[in-house]
Structure formats: C-alpha cells, structure tokens
Amino acid sequence: MTGYEIAKHAKVTPEKVRAYTESVDFSHLSAAERAAAIQKLAAMLNALSLEERQSLRQDRTAYKWFEKMTEDEKGEFLEATMPTGFKQMIGAFEDMPPDKRKKVVDQAIKQMKDQREKMAASGQLPSPGTNAVVLSQELQDKVTKIGLQSFYSHSSAQTKAELAPFLEEMQRTMESGRMLRQPRQP
C-alpha cells in the first residue's frame, strides 16, 4: 500500500463520522467505553473542516449521542470539539467595546436568518433544532453587555451546543472584519 492510499484511508470524512456514530450503540457502553467513544468522535470532528462539521450538524449526525450524554460528558465533548479559533474569537469579542459587540451579534444573527431564508427558498430547510437563531433579544443584550465569555462560562452544556451555529457565524463575521472596519471618511 502506498503512502497516498494509507492517507486516503486515514482521512476523516463526514461519511466516516456518520458510519462511526451509527455503528456504536452509545447508550449501551460502560463509562470507560463512553469516554473513549466520545474522545474518538471529538477527534474525528476536529479533523473535519468547518463546512463538513456544519453539514453533520444540519443532519444531526454529530450530535445523535449528545442527548444520551451526562452533563459532564456533554461538557467534555463540547470542550474537546470547540475549535481553538472559538476561544480566540471569544477573547477578541471580550476586548471589544459594547457598540462593536452589538454590531457583531446583530450581523451574525442577520447572516443566520439570511442563510435559513435561502435554504427555505431552495427547499433545503435544515432539520428542526439546527441552525435556528438561538438568542432572544434579551440574551443578545446580555451577551453584548456582559460579554460572551461570562455568558458562555455560565451556560449549560445544552445551551452551549445550541449556541454553536451562532458562535460559528460570529467567528466568520469577526474574521471577515467587515463589521469591525471603520467607515471611510470622505
């Protein structure tokens, strides 16, 4: 077998993640087996691109086990699968003044709504419970005022999982820099 063939078989794909989650009966594993299975799933997810992870979230593949996990397992899974970029993004968000935080939150929510509308128009509405805008106006105001780190650190594992699409959109918004650039003076 050549190096290319070995690499091809070793490369994690969304299909391999689907096959893994379907092949393991998570609810019948011992605590040690569950921990090992969660770590393997986390490693597989971390090897995927952002777009591949989002496709698995849309069809709920990556999170089929989530409802069966204990709160501690959920926390460990989320910590293991949170990209380093998220942690950096949360830190950068914390350093922003409240007016810029509000712009980022508003833009991320607008992008998510626009994406849902495009999917609905093309007949590709995602599964229920995926990619929905999860922040009420009250929560948007709270995130803007106290910062994402404080909000996120006090949230339950379930809330953190529900926030993942929003955080991804915020990260994309902040990375693009569109909302953070100062308007040009004439």
For every predicted segment, state its role:
Residues 44, 80, 92, 166-169, ...:
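Residues that form generic nucleotide/phosphate-binding pockets
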Residues 50, 113-117, 172, 179:
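A generic secondary-structure boundary signal that marks alpha-helix termini
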Residues 60-152:
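Non-cytosolic head/periplasmic domains of membrane-anchored proteins
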Residues 157-186:
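Extracytoplasmic/luminal low-complexity segments enriched in Pro/Gly and acidic/polar residues
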Residues 3, 8-11, 87, 142, ...:
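Residue-level signal for the start and early helices of compact helical domains
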Residues 3-76, 180-184:
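Immediate post-signal-peptide N-terminus of mature secreted/exported proteins
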